[in-house]
Amino acid sequence: MRKYFFFDIDGTLTTPLTADYPDSTRETIRQLQAQGHFVSLATGRIQADATEVARELEIPALVSDGGNAVTVEGEILYHEGLPLPLCYRLFADTDWKKHPWAITTENRKYRITSTAGYLEKVKDRYYETEIIPGYDYRKAEKIYKIFIACTRKESEEIPLHGLPSVWFREDTLLIEPVHKERGIFEIMKKYHLTDEQIVVFGDGMNDCSMFRKEWMTVAMGNGKAPLKEKAKYITKNADEDGIYEACRHFGWI
């Protein structure tokens, strides 16, 4: 039976500390496709960022933006942003002098903030950050991500109004979609798949929604404990050939 594999990127395909792709992981992806299986990413990264990874690993499909986008063979099937009414409520009800913000409004690693205070509070520079004084977020056609500079304790003061969130870093709460299973369902619909054909790999809390009982779920050894509890199989760490080990164990390669 042809299987359809969905891999998280960070901490699953990449090693947790160095963010490298182990040689065994690259070879496993190659062998899976050589055996006739379908391989896709399933990541919270924005579509353009995930596309770079897909090209490097020669993966033909990607569920990106936490399930808010699906791309197959270079064609974007859909790419949605966060619900704007909820974003507007968040902006209206939060003390932004205390918790500076930045938003991603384009399909690239780029974010806009209205104050220099954001870059003073956060350390990461993974996204290009432009400071536009007086920027009006309501002019954005789409908002893909909202970065909020705060600690875990301070995050209790932020009214999310049902918006999904993950921790980007210890100093940054990231508002982004966390329903990767939605993208998997879209691919299942496109190819008329059964639940028995789906295999998902992950390590983080934003992978929980795609660890469904009807699918084959593999957690990395370095994964979060709640995810491991949902998994049908726990493999070795990402930096200990965990992807290869699981695929060999089940005879997929």
Q: Predicted segments — roles?
A:
Residues 23-117:
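Active-site phosphate-binding/coordination module
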Residues 32, 43, 146, 184, ...:
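Residue-level signal for inorganic ion chemistry
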Residues 57-58, 66, 159-163, 213-214, ...:
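Short, structured coil segments at secondary-structure junctions
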Residues 59-67, 80, 123, 166-167, ...:
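Short hydrophobic/aromatic-enriched beta-strand-loop microsegments
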